[in-house]
């Protein structure tokens, strides 16, 4: 739902929405017309049957392993790590495809806004072996080892020298990856408020399963936010 909101109101708008604070000049509430439009379009997806009938109880990784992998679902909303996670479950001859989360009419961001590199290798500031830790990180993310990772873990290469080593399974990702103009935080910042995240998750599931309409979703979130 974070990406969906961000297409309408941008990442700063999403952060403002869930925290109730202004972000980089953006101030958005649950009464905002674009927030309502986002909720209405999400509810429309549910009404048209775009979501799994099991979505109300779908817990990771059930959707990708039990519905997408056997071919019962045509699309799964996920990241470039999916081919690696699902490689033992999908058919050997599966032809992987990919497209960015779509643009929306009159949206703040289009489909060139993406979340990239949301996992990191870090060194503790108090480490007494920081130099050696950095050498290990270099070893893992460059040269032959990096190329080996693309083969065994089906991941995007981190070393520019391996820019031609993208796995076949991720061939469809590269064009959109290279075209990225705006970089999102994880989930476009929708989890910026720990107090509201569980309620948002619960009501998003209800919205996607048709248990709430857009107005009911907005009402529930306003109550949770104290608006």
Question: Model-derived features: where do they sit?
Answer:
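Extracytoplasmic/periplasmic solute-binding protein
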Residues: 1-27, 73
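Glycine-centered hinge/linker elements that transmit conformational signals in sensory
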Residues: 23-55
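C-terminal capping/gating helix-and-loop segments adjacent to ligand/active sites or protein-protein/ligand interfaces
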Residues: 115, 151-163, 171-227
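Short helix-initiation/N-cap motifs at beta->coil->alpha
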Residues: 54-69
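Short helix-loop capping/hinge motifs at secondary-structure junctions, enriched
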Residues: 7-12, 48, 126-133, 206
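Alpha-to-beta junction loops
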Residues: 69-78, 94
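Beta->alpha turn/N-cap motifs
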Residues: 78-83, 119
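Extracytoplasmic/periplasmic substrate-recognition and gating elements
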Residues: 88-153
């Amino acid at each position: 739902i974070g990406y969906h909101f961000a297409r309408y109101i941008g990442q700063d708008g999403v952060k403002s929405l869930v925290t109730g604070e202004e972000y980089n000049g953006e101030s958005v509430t649950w009464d905002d017309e674009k927030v309502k439009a986002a909720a209405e379009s999400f509810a429309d997806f549910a009404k048209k049957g775009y979501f799994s009938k099991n979505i109300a109880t779908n817990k990771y990784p059930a959707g990708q392993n039990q519905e997408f992998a056997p071919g019962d679902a045509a699309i799964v909303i996920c990241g470039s790590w999916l081919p690696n996670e699902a490689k033992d479950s999908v058919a050997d001859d599966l032809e992987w495809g990919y497209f960015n989360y779509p643009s929306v009419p009159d949206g703040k961001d289009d489909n060139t806004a993406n979340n990239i590199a949301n996992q990191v290798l870090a060194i503790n500031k108090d480490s007494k072996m920081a130099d050696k830790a950095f050498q290990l990180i270099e070893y893992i993310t460059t040269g032959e080892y990096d190329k080996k990772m693309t083969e065994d873990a089906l991941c995007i290469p981190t070393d520019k020298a391996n820019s031609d080593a993208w796995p076949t399974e991720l061939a469809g990702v590269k064009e959109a990856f290279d075209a990225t103009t705006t970089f999102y935080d994880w989930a476009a910042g929708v989890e910026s408020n720990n107090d509201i995240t569980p309620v948002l998750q619960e009501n998003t599931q209800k919205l996607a399963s048709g248990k709430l309409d857009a107005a009911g979703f907005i009402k529930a979130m306003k109550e949770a936010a104290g608006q």
